[in-house]
A protein has these predicted regions:
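Fe(II)/2-oxoglutarate oxygenase catalytic core
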Residues: 1-155
Length: 155
C-alpha cells in the first residue's frame, strides 16, 4: 500500500532557508514554547519545541512570507497529486491552508514532537495533508512514522 509520504528536495533554496531561520531567531516576541510531554515505552518523557504561528496577528511581519509559502506549497501539491495518482474523486473541490507554523527543534535537548493525532473532534476534522519543509540538515534530525517504520531525514 502506498504510504503517500513523498519527499521533494530543494523546494526552498539555501538562501531562502537561511532567511527563514534568521527571521525566526529574531522574532522572539512571537515564539511559543509548546509542551509535548508524553509517555513512551521508557516512561514519561518531557518534550518541548519552540514555534511561531506565522499569522499570529493582523500586523505580522510574516505576511509576505506566508504568501510566498502558500504559492510554493500549491505548486508542490499539484506535483504530489500527479505523482501519487490522486484523482479528482480523492481530492476536495474546495480546501484551504492552515496558517503556516515554523517549529524549531534544538539538538541535544528535549525538543521533539511525539507521534500524535491532529484530528480530535468534528471541529478539527479538516486536515488531510501535512507538509514539512526542513530548513537545515541537522545531523540526527528526522521525522519518524512508527506505524509504517518510515524515517525521513532532514536535508
Amino acid at each position: 500500500m502506498n504510504s503517500y509520504i513523498t519527499v521533494y528536495d530543494q523546494v526552498l533554496s539555501d538562501d531562502q532557508c537561511d532567511y527563514f531561520i534568521d527571521k525566526f531567531e529574531k522574532d522572539t516576541s512571537a515564539h511559543e514554547v509548546q509542551n509535548n510531554s508524553h509517555f513512551s515505552e521508557e516512561g514519561e518523557r518531557n518534550a518541548t519545541l519552540t514555534q511561531i504561528n506565522m499569522l499570529h496577528s493582523p500586523n505580522t511581519i510574516w505576511r509576505e512570507d506566508v504568501n510566498f509559502l502558500t504559492q510554493t506549497i500549491g505548486k508542490c501539491v499539484e506535483v504530489y497529486k500527479d505523482q501519487n495518482y490522486i484523482t479528482p474523486y480523492q481530492w476536495p473541490d474546495k480546501y484551504s491552508l492552515e496558517p503556516p507554523k515554523m517549529k524549531r527543534y534544538l539538538a541535544n535537548t528535549s525538543d521533539e514532537f511525539p507521534p500524535h493525532v491532529d484530528v480530535l473532534d468534528y471541529e478539527t476534522a479538516r486536515r488531510f495533508l501535512v507538509i514539512f519543509m526542513y530548513l537545515n540538515d541537522n545531523i540526527g534530525g528526522h521525522t519518524y512514522f512508527p506505524s509504517m517504520d518510515i524515517e525521513i531525514e532532514c536535508k
